[in-house]
Amino acid sequence: KDIEKSLNALSQIVALENPTIKEFPEKKMKCAVVEMNGIALEFLEDNSEDGFLAKFNRKKGDAIHHFCLLSDDMEKDVAALRQKGIPMLDLEPRIGLRGKKIAFTAPDALRGISIELSEP
């Protein structure tokens, strides 16, 4: 809900350099990426009334929405998941906030948490 509060809470646990918070006015979203020991954590704030994160936050509060796995071949990996019967929100890869191809599984694929596939 509040990207600054989330980053501040994390900084109480681990040393963080002030990450850049990027604004995407056309999507009514903010995004910050924190990299630690080879892991990237992406924090999102949805300031719309009907965006997917706004709906998620109303339903579940502040919680992990998804985690991301990197893919060197998005089309192949999306097709493989679909062939295994994994429900997908994105039947084909699309361009995400960072300008990379992404695709999400449906939340019910992993007990309420989506998996995002993304180009590196």
Specify the residue positions occupied by each region the protein language model found.
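Short, composition-biased local secondary-structure segments
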Residues: 1-5, 45-50
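N-terminal beta-strand motif that seeds the catalytic metal site of vicinal oxygen chelate
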Residues: 1-8, 62-71
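Conserved active-site tyrosine of GNAT-family acetyltransferases
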Residues: 6-11, 81
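A cross-kingdom feature marking solvent-exposed beta-strand/loop segments within repeated
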Residues: 11-29, 47-65, 84-102
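Vicinal oxygen chelate
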Residues: 22, 32-35, 41-42, 69, ...
